Amino acid sequence: SRKVVISPSAVERMLVTLATGRGLMLVGEPGTAKSLLSELLATAISGDAGLTIQGGASTTEDQIKYGWNYALLINHGPSTEALVPAPLYQGMRDGKIVRFEEITRTPLEVQDCLLGMLSDRVMTVPELTGEASQLYAREGFNIIATANTRDRGVNEMSAALKRRFDFETVFPVPHFLPCDNKNTAVLFPGGPRSALPAC
């Protein structure tokens, strides 16, 4: 069933962006269902919307790329067994969509760690040696990010990172059809929202 009130042409543009390997940035006012839309797109394309990064002032690069199991790291040194993959690592390894919520709330230096993954489609793991030190993204990997227009200026994205994304504005629904409450069940058995075009 249809979940989001949005122009079909906008959805088509989003799908074209993702199909061509470009990152997708959904921007708009709070409450315009950007997160739900990114979840639906990720599920439709990858069959999985669980690879999600929640942006914030305390978000670190380890939470985005990878971390370490320190017990294994101390006992055996850096290895693929000791590496703990974060959403970005998992998405590149498995060829899936990664969702980055509220990216403009994330510190600039953390945002810019996405540059190599979006342009060269490769993540370097300097702690490892040989082939394990380079993770190349499988086909299907991409990033859908969201940003609130109210957060503009909090952590403004660099020009280099902006060039890696296609921006799509998600607009609020301008108005709902007027309806007398006592007639709601008769006029719209599915509720007032059932009368609105959705996709």
Regions from the PLM with identified roles:
Residues S1-P197:
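AAA+ P-loop NTPase catalytic core and its hallmark functional loops
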